[in-house]
């Protein structure tokens, strides 16, 4: 008896296309930029520390606001928050491309992280809402496969553009892709939200943002100052205690941002584990000589 064929509806196909393109923005931008860093550094006269913050300013805001972005999507509408994130990401990409100083680029990259925090969790949550149990695994598999391919393609593109002195084009490419995703999402993909999300878990949002920001900042600055530095230890301790408090709050909150029972679902845990591996791979790609010491 042959395996049952999974056919996607028209809405599901457009949803898959939109989320793949949106994720491609983030993956290509991250991996292509890594290869173009030497050209960028030479053009803008960026110091080693500033170069680190071009990358890590993005990572700090992305990691700190990631769960908040997902929670806002459940509460106010996944498409709405996704598109707001897409708008922030594309506008900040334009600002990155026209930056004339290291400070301008670092600030624009930080706003890219804010946009990515609204955009990234939206991709998977929109997929999960539009695909049933039978087709969800296949859809997430396709999403992750194409995301991996774009992560591989990114360095090739970045090296080619950097070689021609066109590193700014890496950021400008996000604009037409964002327009395509924006139109497709509005016209073809219906809005969805979590019907059980009644209000924002404010304490959870504050604790998880503080926790992730503290941990991320501590690890970002540890190569420069060392783990024995008081600021680094304080940052890591505050971040760690905040995340522990976040878990406790989620256990007893009436409106938890991240219900702990979700981890009993193999689909949820597997999807998040897959995302972790993909972004861990990107984190490895983003290491540069300055970071490696």
Where are the regions that the model predicts?
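A residue-level signal for alpha-helical anchor/packing sites in multi-pass solute transporters
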Residues: 126, 160, 188, 249, ...
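C-terminal membrane-cytosol helix-exit motif in multi-pass small-molecule transporters
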Residues: 175-194, 209-221, 238-253
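Helix-boundary and loop/linker segments of multi-pass membrane transporters
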Residues: 4-12, 97, 197-199, 225, ...
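12-transmembrane solute porter fold
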Residues: 14-24, 28, 33-35, 48, ...
């Amino acid at each position: 008896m042959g395996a049952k064929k999974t056919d996607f509806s028209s809405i599901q196909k457009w949803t898959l296309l939109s989320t793949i393109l949106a994720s491609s923005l983030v993956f290509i931008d991250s991996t292509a930029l890594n290869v173009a860093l030497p050209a960028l550094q030479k053009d803008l006269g960026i110091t080693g520390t500033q170069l680190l913050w071009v990358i890590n300013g993005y990572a700090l805001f992305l990691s700190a606001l990631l769960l908040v972005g997902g929670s806002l999507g459940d509460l106010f509408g996944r498409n709405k928050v996704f598109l707001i994130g897409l708008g922030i990401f594309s506008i900040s990409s334009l600002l990155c491309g026209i930056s004339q100083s290291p400070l301008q680029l670092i600030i624009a990259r930080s706003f890219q992280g804010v946009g990515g925090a609204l955009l990234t969790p939206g991709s998977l949550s929109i997929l999960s809402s539009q695909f049933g149990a039978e087709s969800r695994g296949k859809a997430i598999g396709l999403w992750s496969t194409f995301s991996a391919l774009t992560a591989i393609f990114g360095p090739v593109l970045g090296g080619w553009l950097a070689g021609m002195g066109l590193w700014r084009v890496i950021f400008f490419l996000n604009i037409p892709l964002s327009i395509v995703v924006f139109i497709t999402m509005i016209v073809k993909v219906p809005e969805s939200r979590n019907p059980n999300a009644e209000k924002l878990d404010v304490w959870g949002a504050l604790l998880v943002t503080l926790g992730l920001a503290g941990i991320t900042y501590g690890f970002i600055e540890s190569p420069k100052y060392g783990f024995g530095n008081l600021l680094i230890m304080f940052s890591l301790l505050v971040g760690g205690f905040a995340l522990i408090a976040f878990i406790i709050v989620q256990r007893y909150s009436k409106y938890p941002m991240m219900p702990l029972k979700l981890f009993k679902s193999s689909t949820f845990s597997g999807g998040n584990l897959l995302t972790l591996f993909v972004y861990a791979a990107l984190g490895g790609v983003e290491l540069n000589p300055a970071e490696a010491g």
